[in-house]
Regions:
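Short, contiguous alpha-helical
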Residues: 1-7, 13, 25, 44-94, ...
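Cysteine-cluster motifs in flexible loop/terminal segments that predominantly coordinate metals
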Residues: 3-16, 288, 293-298
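Short, charged, low-complexity loops and linkers
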Residues: 10-26, 100-102
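Acidic/histidine-rich alpha-helical segments that form the ligand environment
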Residues: 27, 31-40, 75, 93-133, ...
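A mid-sequence interfacial segment
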Residues: 88-123, 260-295
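Electropositive, beta-rich accessory/interaction domains or terminal extensions
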Residues: 170-270, 274, 279-281, 286, ...
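A conserved acidic, glycine/proline-rich C-terminal tail/linker
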Residues: 288-314
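Well-ordered alpha/beta subsegment
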Residues: 309-330
Length: 330
């Protein structure tokens, strides 16, 4: 974050030009929930173990993310209240140091992530806030919106680090292999239609040529792809529901994976692209017609965690076609 150009990151794919203030508000509002899903039932010893001496543990990353969120939120409060406000330099550790490991309790870390995430979401959700205001750091001038998006970059990048750390330590989603059963696109709305054997390009915003009709609730960077399971679809169809691949709006239909094992932070090599799961997709009324009784909420996380569709970030762009392998935790 230098205050003079849009922030980008080659490692995680972050590009501030692809983000809106409301995207950041949604991210921070869900931060604690995503973290809870990502580390649910993982042994505390694994959560406190560093994958390498100079790489933070999962819980150290969580503590850092809540601290960064709190510091940037405090600065934003000042900037939004007074344009040109002078800001101090925050004293935050930017990386792990070998030998300074800290053992943490997971509930305290999760509570802090939820508390700070909700506070930042409330700030970002303010109507007509002057996001063009600037703050003056000792060595740079930073716009309020850029500072907010820097915070979004920090927590999302470290959420990626958490997923990689859990995979390296054998926690979270286990390694597995499946395949791409179908790729689906539309000009907006459902159903999305089968691409057949055509190759698709997966960019930072998802499958090229696919569109969303509702940009208020869809199309955020952490919703670049929506993935679902042929096994779940087959189970629903066998129960009498008129549903098929693409009907529920997923643009990547996968086969051969233990769907209930997936969680936020899991990484999937889909064709040559690398996808990281972000959060369960919330079903909507447009999907009513695919269920015999109209009860589309049966595929919500709250009702049936093993039936949910998953949203994902694109961490590495690539190409894919139906039949390609899908490697979980490559």
């Amino acid at each position: 974050m230098d205050g003079s150009r849009p922030e980008t990151c080659a490692e995680c794919g972050f590009d501030a030009r692809q983000w809106r203030v409301r995207d950041a508000a949604t991210l921070f509002g869900a931060l604690g929930f995503w973290w809870r899903l990502a580390i649910a039932d993982v042994d505390l010893e694994i959560l406190n173990r560093r994958p390498a001496p100079a790489v933070w543990s999962v819980l150290e990353y969580g503590r850092h993310s809540s601290a960064v969120t709190a510091v940037i939120r405090s600065a934003l409060e000042l900037m939004l209240a007074e344009d040109g406000r002078a800001l101090g330099t925050p004293a935050l550790s930017a990386s792990a140091i070998e030998g300074n490991e800290v053992v943490l309790g997971h509930e305290a870390v999760l509570d802090a992530l939820e508390r700070e995430g909700q506070a930042m979401a409330a700030l970002a959700g303010r109507q007509s806030a002057p996001w063009g205001n600037v703050g003056k750091l000792p060595d740079a001038t930073i716009q309020a919106e850029a500072a907010l998006l820097h915070a979004a970059h920090d927590v999302s990048h470290h959420f990626m680090d958490v997923g990689r750390g859990l995979a390296a330590l054998g926690g979270g989603t286990p390694a597995a292999q499946g395949r791409v059963a179908q790729l689906n696109v539309s000009a907006g709305g459902v159903p999305k239609l089968d691409l057949g054997s055509d190759e698709a390009v997966i960019g930072w915003r998802g499958i090229e040529g696919d569109r969303q009709a509702d940009h208020k609730h869809h199309g955020r960077p952490f919703q670049a792809l929506c993935l679902w399971s042929t096994e779940v679809i087959a189970e629903l169809a066998a129960a009498g529901h008129p549903i098929a691949a693409g009907c529920a709006g997923e643009n990547v239909t996968l086969a051969g994976l233990e769907w209930a094992s997936l969680r936020p932070g899991a990484r999937l090599r889909v064709g040559t692209a690398l996808v990281e799961l972000s959060h369960p997709a919330v079903p909507c009324q447009k999907q009513t017609r695919w269920f015999a009784d109209g009860d589309f909420a049966r595929i919500s996380y709250e009702r049936n965690p093993a039936w949910v569709r998953w949203y994902g970030w694109v961490r590495e762009q690539g190409r894919v076609r139906a039949g390609d392998a899908v490697i979980v935790q490559p």
